[in-house]
């Protein structure tokens, strides 16, 4: 017959705790898999982002004007607020890096337009439908700006124009007295270039001489349209 061995309770409990401690110590941890892993020190800090990236989360920087003379008024228009605010922020940052003192954006009164049109044809022609469109505006003013720098700023904004945003700019250039006399003293070659451009504005082309008018009247199509048998003349 087999005898049952009676073990003391204290010895059994101490053995179980020792096995539990041994099992926990033998478990592998993720940090133990990397050999010679350097321990991070408390003094080390995470690398910071570049200044240009940090500046995106801050308000755009602005330069102070010395005299406060307006050089350009840029008006931005859009039907949505988000693209308008985004492009206004972009325009202010571009003006700062070009050395232009910019002020704004100043909210302007919104433009509200409404239309009433027939809803549909046939049986719905007596019912009407209303449409409404709201235009949001912002104003950015450049003061004490060089005209060439202002034109460069506007060209940069046109190149990188955001969709859904319209622009309207008014510029002022200040020159010395007697600028008209300088224009009169231009060389003949430059005057010819200016006259060539002005010739495309308005009705400056002459009708023609009397011989040209008589030639037009003697055309066959003109006589058939007027029902003339004898060609007309310009003689009195």
Curated annotation (Swiss-Prot):
Residues 29-49 are annotated as: Disordered. Residues 1-24 form a transit peptide. It holds the Pfam family Ribosomal_S10. Residues 39-49 have a biased composition (Basic and acidic residues). One of its GO terms (molecular function) is structural constituent of ribosome. InterPro entries: Ribosomal_uS10, Ribosomal_uS10_dom, Ribosomal_uS10_dom_sf. It is found in: Mitochondrion. One of its GO terms (cellular component) is ribosome. One of its GO terms (biological process) is translation. The keyword Metal-binding does not apply. Coiled coil: none annotated. Keywords: Mitochondrion, Ribonucleoprotein, Ribosomal protein, Transit peptide. Belongs to the universal ribosomal protein uS10 family. Involved in mitochondrial genome encoded proteins translation. Involved in the binding of tRNA to the ribosomes. Part of the mitochondrial small ribosomal subunit. PANTHER family: 30S RIBOSOMAL PROTEIN S10 FAMILY MEMBER. This is Small ribosomal subunit protein uS10m. It comes from Gibberella zeae (strain ATCC MYA-4620 / CBS 123657 / FGSC 9075 / NRRL 31084 / PH-1). The gene is RSM10.
């Amino acid at each position: 017959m087999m005898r049952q061995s009676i073990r003391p309770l204290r010895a059994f409990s101490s053995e179980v705790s020792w096995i539990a401690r041994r099992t926990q110590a033998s478990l592998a941890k993720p940090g133990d898999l990397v050999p010679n892993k350097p321990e991070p020190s408390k003094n080390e800090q995470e690398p910071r982002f570049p200044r240009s990236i940090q500046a995106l989360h801050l308000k755009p920087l602005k330069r102070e004007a010395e005299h406060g003379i307006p050089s350009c008024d840029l008006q931005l228009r859009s039907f949505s607020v988000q693209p308008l605010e985004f492009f206004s922020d972009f325009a202010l940052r571009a003006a700062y890096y070009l050395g232009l003192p910019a002020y704004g954006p100043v909210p302007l009164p919104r433009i509200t337009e409404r239309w009433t049109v027939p809803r549909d044809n046939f049986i719905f022609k007596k019912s009407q439908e209303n449409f409404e469109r709201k235009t949001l505006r912002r104003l950015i003013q450049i003061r004490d700006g060089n005209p060439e720098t202002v034109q460069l700023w506007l060209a940069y904004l046109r190149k990188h124009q955001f969709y859904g945003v319209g622009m309207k700019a008014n510029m002022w250039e200040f020159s010395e007295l007697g600028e008209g006399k300088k224009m009169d003293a231009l060389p003949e070659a430059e005057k010819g270039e200016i006259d060539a451009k002005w010739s495309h504005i308005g009705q400056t082309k002459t009708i023609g001489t009397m011989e040209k008018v008589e030639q037009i009247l003697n055309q066959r199509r003109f006589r058939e349209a007027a029902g003339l048998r004898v060609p007309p003349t310009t003689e009195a």
